[in-house]
Amino acid sequence: MRRRTLITFTIAGALFSCACSRPATDTAEEHSPDTYKVRFDTTKGQFVVTVTRAWAPLGADRFYSLVKSGFYDGARFFRMLPGFVVQFGIAGDPAANTKWHNANLVDDPVTQSNHRGTITYGTAGPNTRTTQVFINLANNARLDSKGFAPFGEVTEGMEVADKFYSEYGEGPPMGGGPDQTRAEAEGTAYFERDFPKLDYVKKASIEK
């Protein structure tokens, strides 16, 4: 089984996204507005992401489609590294994970720096963005040259992102935190059984 590295270097190890060999299904994207806001209601409170399509058009379109479809509703903040990033984007519904698993996006050019508060897709190398994203909890400009293209930023409630549960630590093979392969396959049941303290998205919605 091949594993997908989201960020090729970190303060405390690599960020991973599993990548099993499964056929992709129809995942056509809707053209997003030039600017739009997404409100995340979470177990720690609310935060708002403002997306600017010009920063990363393909990434902005994908995020718009995922939010509108309810993909992020119930998604755990399964990897929290205080002072670096918080990562999410594995759906609670295994069928949704299967649908989007191999729906890779062509890379957008990096037009903005990965400063604190920006939101960016993880990658497994060139042209491999799917659903997993991370919020930069610090100024991570060193990621810019690695191809990580921010498509938006947290404009309200950044203090909420700083508070997500972090004690489970790194996932395998570096630690005992959530295993992304199992999380994709089992969804919410896996997190509730083995990692019940993780914070999660109650509802993500496009603001009118």
Model regions: which residues?
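Hydrophobic helical h-region of N-terminal Sec-dependent signal peptides
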Residues: T10-F16
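Cyclophilin-like peptidyl-prolyl cis-trans isomerases
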Residues: F16-K208
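N-terminal export leaders
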Residues: R3-T8
